[in-house]
């Protein structure tokens, strides 16, 4: 049986400015760089940063420690207007 393809609607889109309303980054403002609709998550530029340790791939190489942006659930963000410094309260 073939699975039916469904469109998952999100209230935010890539490139929009949002404010985080819940979690350890609460109150911070950032721009969405990627939307993950299947898991209802978004990745915001320079927010929700995590440290990742990478193992050495070759014998002579050394490992790395990199910092990456982790996804945050879309219900924890709200659209934000930079020109008037206010958040848009209604959710779609």
UniProtKB/Swiss-Prot annotation:
It is found in: Plastid, Chloroplast. The keyword Chloroplast applies. GO terms for cellular component: chloroplast; ribonucleoprotein complex; ribosome. The keyword Ribosomal protein applies. Pfam families: KOW (PF00467), ribosomal_L24 (PF17136). SUPFAM superfamilies: Translation proteins SH3-like domain (SSF50104). Keywords: Chloroplast, Plastid, Ribonucleoprotein, Ribosomal protein, RNA-binding, rRNA-binding. One of two assembly initiator proteins, it binds directly to the 5'-end of the 23S rRNA, where it nucleates assembly of the 50S subunit. HAMAP family: Ribosomal_uL24_B. Belongs to the universal ribosomal protein uL24 family. Part of the 50S ribosomal subunit. This is Large ribosomal subunit protein uL24c.
